Regions:
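Conserved ABC transporter NBD signature motif
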Residues: 60-71, 75-76
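Catalytic Walker B motif of ABC-type/P-loop ATPase nucleotide-binding domains
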Residues: 158-162
Length: 295
């Protein structure tokens, strides 16, 4: 596979008169976890649908595993797996039956299907629930089964569209460990998420899009440092943040920011200083707030 698992140049897509993606340039190195952040309606799902061959682009170049999406779509499909926002499993069947059925549909023999099913059940911590109907599974178990199904045939690139939406903290962190293990196996993971902590914890590279355009790309550390060295917060008596400002961290800059922040405020309000977070990055880049993961 190419050193770049995914590359887009000037990617554009519109529906009717609405421009959804407007000149997206991305480079996803092979073997990395790459996170796409953006508010609702930013174009995340449309982009992942194009990259996974579900939609055609209107303009631009898209290469997946070195293959041009416009001319080598069949080869692209043989290089990717996709797990969407909603679990695509048969709730009447057991977890084992779901996996074995997909193995057979993928062309594996009965013996190969049995072996691959057992392997995936172990890897995704579903062996104990293998013979239980999926309708009895928790949300986290369903998501793990859904990802396992997408990996029945081993492919170098996995697309995950908001994989932990709706999961509780324990299930979400369990899935994070599985995603990190997939990276260790050499799989490139391209995920979209609404959760800033998820991108911060998992991603080697993060791209932020807003209104169909890339507004920033970098590591979590570089994105945080790009907005300043320290963040000043002013809190009221109820411990609510009433004002905030990112600063370079120098005494001169912090004094100036404090003077501006504290104008016309009660002297009883408290000041705190912290390092920038992904929340600060996102708000600075998009003027919107992302959804916080449930705790």
């Amino acid at each position: 596979m190419s050193k770049l698992a995914i590359e887009t140049i000037g990617l554009r897509k519109k529906f009717g008169n609405q421009v959804v993606l407007d000149g997206i340039d991305m480079q996803v190195p092979a073997g990395t976890i790459y996170a796409l952040l953006g508010p609702n309606g930013a174009g995340k799902t449309t982009l992942i649908h194009i990259l996974s061959t579900l939609y055609d682009q209107d303009d631009g170049i898209v290469k997946i595993a070195g293959y041009d999406l416009a001319t080598d779509k069949d080869m692209v499909r043989q290089s990717i797996s996709l797990t969407g926002q909603f679990a695509a499993v048969d709730e009447v069947l057991t977890g084992e039956e779901n996996l074995r059925m997909l193995c057979r549909l993928s062309g594996l023999t009965a013996a190969e299907s049995r072996s691959r099913t057992e392997e995936l059940l172990r890897h995704f911590d579903l062996a104990a629930a293998a013979k239980k109907r999926v309708k009895t599974y928790s949300g986290g178990m369903r998501r793990r089964l859904d990802i396992a199904i997408s990996l029945v045939v081993k492919r170098p690139i996995l697309f995950l569209d908001e994989p932990t939406t709706g999961l509780d903290t324990i299930s979400r962190r369990s899935l994070w460990q599985i995603i990190l293990q997939l990276k260790e196996q050499g799989i490139t993971v391209f995920l979209t998420t609404q959760y800033l902590e998820e991108a911060d914890q998992l991603a080697d590279i993060i791209t932020v899009i807003d209104s169909g355009r890339v507004v920033a790309t970098g590591t979590a550390k570089s994105l945080k440092s790009s907005i300043g060295g320290e963040v000043i917060e002013i809190r009221n008596e109820k411990d609510e943040i009433v004002r905030t400002a990112a600063t370079s961290g120098t005494l001169l800059d912090m004094n100036q920011a404090l003077n501006e922040l504290t104008q016309s405020l009660s002297p009883t309000m408290r000041v705190s200083i912290r390092k920038p977070s992904m929340d600060d990055v996102f708000i600075a880049l998009t003027s919107q707030e992302m959804e916080r993961a449930p705790s």
